[in-house]
Amino acid sequence: LEKTKAEWVIWSAGTFQFLIYKRMVANDNWYIGAGGKGGPSRTNAIDRDACIHFIRAALSSSTITKFLIISALSSRRDRAAWWDDESWAMARKINEEMPTYYKAKLAADETLTALGEQKKGFGYIVLRPGGLTDDKEVGKISFGKTKARGMVTRGDVAEVAVKLLEKESVRGWFDLLGGEEETDAAVERVLREGINSMEGEDLEAMKKDVAPL
């Protein structure tokens, strides 16, 4: 990271790297890290350990000002206030079916959040899409606080990621599904209204669980 003199870090997986790259090809101030696929050991090594290493390195860097991680909609400890019991049960079921992935993602999300909150002026972005499709980008989304289950195209996720990075002073968790609102309008609305889907999570507990820099 020091060698590249990057200002932003994007931690993503698979085809997101290429999709985000296409949208940011004119910029030279960012670095993309790849998320992991495979068995539990690889998931922990990449989605948890390597990601946390990059988070800590980014926050210790003198040049990096933003870190965006592509997480998952169900990656949270507590029920979102805008979800009903059925929605929360559905999210928990997803996490129980993929426990290693869930725990790895949550550890990375909470590390970025806890440490990002403690560094003044640092932009931390936890982008949390639902189920992913390879369909053509739609350009219409549900963003900020969404229902607990749904689909979104990878292209739409990449587009939202770029729009968030291009804004100043963005911090927080942002849920994302396909929807009916134009992408530009949705992003502007959520940032203007200060919507953060971390609401309901225990930030102080995160800070206690995460070792300081």
Regions found by a protein language model. Give the residues of each.
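NAD(P)H-binding glycine-rich loop region in Rossmannoid oxidoreductase-like domains
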Residues: 1-61, 165-168
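Oxidoreductase cofactor-interface core, primarily capturing Rossmann-like NAD(P)-dependent enzymes
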Residues: 16-17, 61-66, 71-213
